[in-house]
Each structure stands twice: as structure tokens, then as C-alpha cells.
Amino acid sequence: MMTDLESRVSRKLMLRIIPFVMLLYFVSFLDRVNVGFAALTMNKAIGLSPTAFGLGGGLFFIGYFLFEVPSNLILHKVGARRWIARVMVSWGIVSLASAFVVGPNSFYALHFLLGVAEAGFFPGIILYLSLWFPTRQRAVAAAWFMAAAPISGAIMKLPPIAGLADWQMLYILEALPAVILGFFVLKYLTDTPSKAQWLAPEERDWLIAKLKTEADARQSHAGHTAGALSALRDPRVLALALIYFGTSADLYTLGL
């Protein structure tokens, strides 16, 4: 059973962090799948064949795959809060530029760049959650965060505004929140529990001690710091990767 102090800290973490990161992931997933909705009118407008459209959609994941690990290596250097903000602003700008594609080549380039820009966001948030939530609450926190993805599929048809087609307005109106939220991340999120002024001193001290105890226990159990190549050979990592592959395939199939 949770102690009263543990219960208070858990409640504050859930209320302060989870709704906000859910909003970030909602916007993230919206920007990924909006191409499927935009295609209803965009393909004809810019002369995009179904094959070219499929290739452009695939290029997003190539950029995402190639730059996800480098992005997370940088994230560890500069901190999750700053890097998440950078990711959101850059993908918002690229998504905004997608409203002005004129043909297959610009469509290909921008969707590849969108994957590059967005690489590292999801694992960056997972890392951020691990800096705040003890092991006991971490799975619940991650589950709430991931619940934002399927919700983002509900999009209404947007009317043309100021001479722009509806698919252009879709890109613009879904890109702007990413840019705005990217800057807001810097103000709202706190780097580490030691800097959390929204926790009472005793709550902050308990959380820091709890996370340190768990980290020391993991380090003692592991006996060494495993590198990326060692992780890729771990059957548990491969099994989790396969599970995530299946989950992502389902979500993107429904979204697109």
C-alpha cells in the first residue's frame, strides 16, 4: 500500500505532467497522420499518384528511423525538456511548410524532413517520465501518455480560408500548436525533481530519494552500464521492439 506521502506525490505528478505530455503526443500523432486526411484533396491538386503518395509517407519513417538514435544521444546531453521543445518547434515548422508543397519532389523532401525533425520525441517523453515516476507508477504514466495517439484520429473537415485549399489549412492549423507548445514546454516542464517548486520540500526529498534508491538498485543488479549494441542483443529489448512494431502498425493503419 502507498503511504500518505507517496500517494500525494503520485497524485501531483499525474496531474502536473501527464495531461500536458498527452497533449504533446496528441499533437505529434496528429501531425503524423494528417497526410492521410490531406490526401483526399491534396493528391489531385499537386498531381500526386497513389504510388507517389505511399512513397512520401514511407520516407517519413525512414527519416524517423535514421535519426531517432542520434536524436536521443543528443537528448541525454542537453536534457529532455530542451530537446523535446526543439523537436516540437522543428516538426511544427516542417509541417507548416508542407502546406505549400507543389509536387511529388517537395512532398518527398518535406515528409523525410518531418521524420528527421520528429525523431526522438516519443522516447524523449518516456525518458522524461522515468526521471519523475518511480517504478511502481511508471507503467500507468506511460499508458496514459500513449492513450493520446488513437484520440488524435478524430479530425473534422476544415473549410478553405484566405484562398487556401482545405488540405493546406489542415497542415497549417495542425502545425501551429506544435510550434506554440514547443516554446511552452520550456516554461512548463521542469528538468528534474530537485527543481520542482510545485512539490512541497518533504515531497521533493522523498521523490529524489526514491528515484535514487531505484537507480542504485538497477545499477547494482546490472553490474555495468550496457551500451546500445548490448541492448540490441538483449532478447527482452527485441521482444518489446516487436510488440511496439505491431502496436504502431495498427495505429498508423487506422490513422492513414
Locate the predicted segments by residue.
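Cytoplasmic helix-loop-helix junction between adjacent transmembrane helices
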Residues: L110-A147
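Conserved MFS/SLC helix-loop-helix module at the cytosolic interface between two early adjacent transmembrane helices
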Residues: L66-N105
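Extracytoplasmic gate region of multi-pass secondary transporters
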Residues: V35-G36, L229-L256
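Extracytoplasmic
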Residues: R16-P50, M156, L254-L256
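Short hydrophobic/alpha-helical segments at membrane-entry points of transmembrane helices
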Residues: G103-H111, L238-L240
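Helix-loop-helix hairpin linking two adjacent transmembrane segments in secondary transporters
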Residues: F145-A196
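Helix-breaking motifs and short loop linkers at transmembrane-helix boundaries and internal kinks
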Residues: G47, G79, F100-S106, A117, ...
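Central cavity-lining transmembrane alpha-helices of secondary-active solute carriers
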Residues: G57-L73, G124
